[in-house]
């Protein structure tokens, strides 16, 4: 259809006048007269410092980035709800679990662990699975991964482990020579390495992976009874991962595949769901395990689980930075009825995660909408950068005081725990570094075993030091002889040397 020039001009004119334009302003609210040209000294003169609009735009642009998370930098989030499947008040007084059908709002952030913000989501890595429950008792963060165990059992090794897995300070490239050098001194990592080098280390979708709390926690009921629990999110979408050839194919097509898939599914109303299960052990039953039940490198074998609720993610963030990037998760964000166990890795995470969020977002991070509790916050924490809280306590910013009745509630005191022994600095008892890696390997079908060997060999064959390679293969041999023998063949490692190391 041919349209006249005058018709086009009239149409464009009508369209432009129909918009209710708002006046562009500076941050102080003052209107901007020209956003296209800087103020200069004459036609060809220098730009003037008095151009405050230009200066402010450049200043704000230079400050758009906040510190990147040291781990879990690349992530995506979604809002949703958790619905309890029963009344579990016999086990815990935690609000989400005390009434069948109770609805608790949640925000979930999925992430890669080691790689940086702009990295491909196809890279092999554990995946973070962090859930913030907004309860009437405060915010509870269940900060986990898509794999049930971790590389180390003591938080004192966490900085070293992350340093080895991060890019080299010389080349700025991740290097298997570095992280296998570290892991050759950490046989406890054998179990986790078997998990992460399986195809579960390259999930096809955030929707098609499970989540685990990794650590044991304590559930406490109204009577003060204590049980140890482990949490697992089971995907109602099933488990789907990328095989080695599909990883390369996907990276060539879409290295944002995890984010794009989640956004597309929720955007079209295909809301993903996960059932939350818990394994429960009494302190007595925990002590009778033939491994240390508080060891983050272990799963609780043959312990039955029970479903406690279902989570549905049904709303996407309106702004990535305000919601997903500024969301702050920490295992120390606990509510009544849930306490940390004595797990040595968890004990360190209680401090480290909260501290890194203070560094990244500042002391008033809980005033950010995505981190703000539904309950009123009543304490005497004050001031700091970007504090916009309306304090109503007047002159009283301390406790106790006769002027203000803001007191503790004894019913929420920490549970008492009996301690025996002496202050010490020793490794845990019953480490059993290799046993569960063997159980995992033998549970795999042949295709999954072959992919595991191929994935591991792909990185081990980049290791120059043959002693490091042989040591690593010996760990997998100790887990399962077939496992180690196949890996020795795939890495051209002398099997006799492997067997000798396995006997050491």
Swiss-Prot record:
Swiss-Prot/TrEMBL cofactor(s): heme
Organism domain of life: Bacteria
EC number: 1.11.1.6
Assigned keywords, A-Z: Heme, Hydrogen peroxide, Iron, Metal-binding, Oxidoreductase, Periplasm, Peroxidase, Signal
Annotated catalysed reactions: 2 H2O2 = O2 + 2 H2O
Protein purpose: Decomposes hydrogen peroxide into water and oxygen; serves to protect cells from the toxic effects of hydrogen peroxide.
UniProt-annotated catalytic positions: 72, 145
Residues spanning the signal sequence: 1-21
GO molecular function: catalase activity; heme binding; metal ion binding
UniProt-annotated location(s): Periplasm
Pfam families for the chain: Catalase, Catalase-rel
Annotated organism of origin: Vibrio parahaemolyticus serotype O3:K6 (strain RIMD 2210633)
Full protein name: Catalase
Annotated positions binding heme: 353
Family indicated by similarity: Belongs to the catalase family.
GO cellular component terms attached to this protein's record: cytoplasm; periplasmic space
């Amino acid at each position: 259809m041919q349209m006249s020039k005058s018709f086009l001009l009239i149409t464009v004119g009508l369209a432009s006048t129909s918009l209710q334009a708002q006046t562009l302003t500076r941050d102080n609210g003052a209107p901007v007269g020209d956003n296209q040209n800087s103020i200069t000294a004459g036609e060809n003169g220098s730009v003037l410092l008095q151009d405050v609009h230009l200066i402010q735009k450049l200043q704000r642009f230079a400050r758009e980035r906040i510190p990147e998370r040291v781990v879990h930098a690349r992530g995506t989030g979604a809002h949703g709800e958790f619905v309890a499947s029963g009344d579990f008040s016999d086990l815990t007084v935690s609000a989400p679990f005390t009434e069948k059908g109770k609805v608790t709002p949640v925000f979930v952030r999925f992430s890669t662990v080691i790689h940086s913000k702009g990295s491909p989501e196809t890279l092999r890595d554990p995946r973070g699975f962090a859930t913030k429950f907004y309860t009437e008792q405060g915010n509870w963060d269940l900060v986990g991964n898509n794999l049930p165990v971790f590389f180390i059992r003591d938080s004192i090794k966490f900085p070293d482990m992350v340093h080895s897995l991060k890019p080299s300070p010389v080349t700025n490239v991740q290097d298997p020579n570095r992280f296998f050098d570290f892991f050759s001194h950490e046989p406890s990592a054998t179990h986790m390495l078997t998990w992460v080098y399986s195809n579960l280390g390259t999930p096809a979708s955030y929707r098609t992976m499970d989540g685990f709390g990794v650590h044991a926690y304590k559930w406490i009921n109204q009577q003060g009874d204590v049980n140890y629990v482990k949490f697992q999110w089971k995907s109602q979408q099933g488990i789907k991962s990328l095989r080695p050839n599909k990883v390369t194919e996907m990276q060539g097509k879409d290295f944002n595949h995890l984010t794009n898939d989640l956004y597309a599914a929720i955007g079209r109303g295909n809301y993903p769901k996960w059932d939350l299960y818990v394994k429960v052990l009494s302190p007595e039953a925990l002590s009778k395990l033939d491994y240390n039940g508080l060891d983050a490198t272990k799963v609780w074998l043959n312990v039955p689980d029970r479903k406690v609720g279902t989570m549905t993610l049904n709303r996407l963030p309106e702004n990535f930075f305000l919601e997903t990037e500024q969301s702050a998760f920490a295992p120390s964000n606990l509510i009544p009825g849930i306490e940390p166990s004595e797990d040595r890795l968890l004990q360190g995470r209680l401090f480290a995660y909260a501290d890194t969020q203070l560094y990244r977002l500042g002391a008033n991070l809980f005033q950010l909408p995505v981190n703000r509790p539904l309950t009123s916050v009543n304490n005497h924490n004050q001031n700091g950068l970007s504090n916009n809280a309306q304090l109503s306590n007047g002159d009283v910013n301390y406790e106790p005081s006769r002027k203000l009745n803001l007191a503790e509630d004894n019913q929420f005191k920490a549970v008492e725990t009996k301690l025996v022994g002496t202050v010490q600095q020793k490794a845990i008892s019953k480490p059993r570094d290799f046993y569960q890696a063997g159980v995992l390997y033998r549970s795999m079908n042949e295709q999954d075993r072959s992919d595991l060997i191929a994935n591991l060999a792909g990185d081990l064959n980049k290791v120059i030091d043959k002693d490091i390679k042989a040591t690593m293969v010996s760990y997998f041999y100790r887990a399962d002889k077939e496992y180690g023998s196949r890996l020795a063949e795939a890495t051209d490692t002398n099997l006799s040397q492997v067997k000798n190391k396995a006997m050491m």
